[in-house]
Amino acid sequence: MSLSTEKKAAIVAEFGRDAKDTGSSEVQIALLTAQINHLQTHFAEHKKDHHGRRGLLRMVSRRRKLLDYLKRTDLALYQSTIARLGLRR
């Protein structure tokens, strides 16, 4: 259920400040968004996977907290990040 190393590296390269920037808020948000999108297809097929759904809700909550932090600290970066990811907030 996790992302491949190549996909993670591509996301870090797209959203990070450099190739090894994995800790910035926008990279973490992008990685969580990719994982959430991947899990949504899983739950379309496995409707009774309640343990996995708990993990999904935890990821959504963590992404929401990171988005709130980014909005509070850098509004322009927040707006560009949600536009690039296609999130509605």
Curated annotation (Swiss-Prot):
- Asked if NADP is a keyword of the record, the answer is no
Q: Name one GO molecular function term.
A: structural constituent of ribosome
Q: Which GO terms describe its biological process?
A: translation
Which terms are listed as keywords in the entry? Ribonucleoprotein, Ribosomal protein, RNA-binding, rRNA-binding
Gene Ontology cellular-component annotations: cytosolic small ribosomal subunit
Q: Which Gene3D superfamilies match?
A: 6.10.250.3130, S15/NS1, RNA-binding
Q: Which InterPro entries match?
A: Ribosomal_uS15, Ribosomal_uS15_bac-type, uS15_NS1_RNA-bd_sf
Q: Which residues form a coiled coil?
A: none
Disulphide connectivity of cysteines:
none
Sorted alphabetically, which NCBIfam families does this protein's record hold? Answer: S15_bact (TIGR00952)
Q: Which PANTHER family match?
A: RIBOSOMAL PROTEIN S15, BACTERIAL AND ORGANELLAR, SMALL RIBOSOMAL SUBUNIT PROTEIN US15M
- Family membership noted in the UniProt record: Belongs to the universal ribosomal protein uS15 family.
Its function, per the record, reads: One of the primary rRNA binding proteins, it binds directly to 16S rRNA where it helps nucleate assembly of the platform of the 30S subunit by binding and bridging several RNA helices of the 16S rRNA. Forms an intersubunit bridge (bridge B4) with the 23S rRNA of the 50S subunit in the ribosome.
Q: How does it assemble?
A: Part of the 30S ribosomal subunit. Forms a bridge to the 50S subunit in the 70S ribosome, contacting the 23S rRNA.
Q: What is this protein called?
A: Small ribosomal subunit protein uS15
